[in-house]
């Protein structure tokens, strides 16, 4: 969740306090989309998600905008009904995309995808290095969602907070 405080310029007094979860989710997804635009392969076709919440939904929208070549979206969640909800909400927006519910099977969602997105609060590895093909783009949004080997096999690590990342690779 997020709260935005809008202040007037001259004295800095608050003039509005707003619920900001939607805008915050859109901002995070925009960052992932911009990264995918510049770092993913030229014509990615498959995007895989672990997580089916609001961050994942916003990320699919951002990824599809910058990478319209995406043809398939695979999604895995802890609960199959969350996968179904994700697909029900997003498939009308992208009729040219095939949606695959992985039925809680993270490997089925991620293995061999061109773009991989983990959007959970998990504190245990969910993404395994063997599922990440060379040249793929991985957007890590939440907690500790991947094996250490995922970062160790990466060609590049691009982040917004190097201190957060460096403790993982030592």
Spans of model-derived segments:
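Residues in the short beta-alpha loop(s) of Rossmann-like NAD(P)-binding domains
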Residues: 53, 78-79, 144
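Rossmann-fold NAD(P)-binding glycine/threonine-rich loop
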Residues: 131-132, 136-170
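Short internal alpha-helix immediately C-terminal to a glycine-rich phosphate-binding loop
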Residues: 27-48, 54-66
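N-terminal ligand-binding/catalytic initiation module
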Residues: 1-25, 33, 40-43
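Short acidic low-complexity segments
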Residues: 97-113, 129
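NAD(P)-binding Rossmann-fold cofactor-contacting core
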Residues: 66-94
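Conserved acidic residues
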Residues: 45, 114, 155
């Amino acid at each position: 969740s997020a709260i935005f405080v809008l202040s007037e310029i001259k004295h800095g007094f608050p003039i509005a306090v707003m619920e900001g979860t939607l805008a915050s989710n859109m901002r995070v997804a925009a960052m992932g989309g911009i990264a995918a635009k510049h770092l993913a392969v030229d014509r990615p076709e498959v995007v895989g998600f672990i997580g089916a919440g609001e961050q994942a939904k916003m990320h699919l929208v951002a990824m599809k905008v910058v990478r319209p070549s995406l043809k398939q979206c695979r999604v895995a969640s802890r609960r199959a009904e969350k996968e179904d909800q994700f697909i029900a909400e997003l498939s009308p927006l992208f009729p040219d995309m095939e949606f695959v519910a992985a039925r809680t099977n993270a490997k089925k969602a991620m293995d061999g995808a061109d773009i991989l997105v983990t959007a959970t609060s998990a504190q245990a590895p969910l993404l395994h290095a063997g599922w990440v093909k060379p040249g793929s783009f991985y957007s890590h949004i939440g907690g500790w969602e991947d094996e250490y080997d995922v970062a160790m096999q990466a060609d590049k690590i691009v982040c917004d907070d190097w201190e957060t990342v460096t403790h993982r690779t030592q």
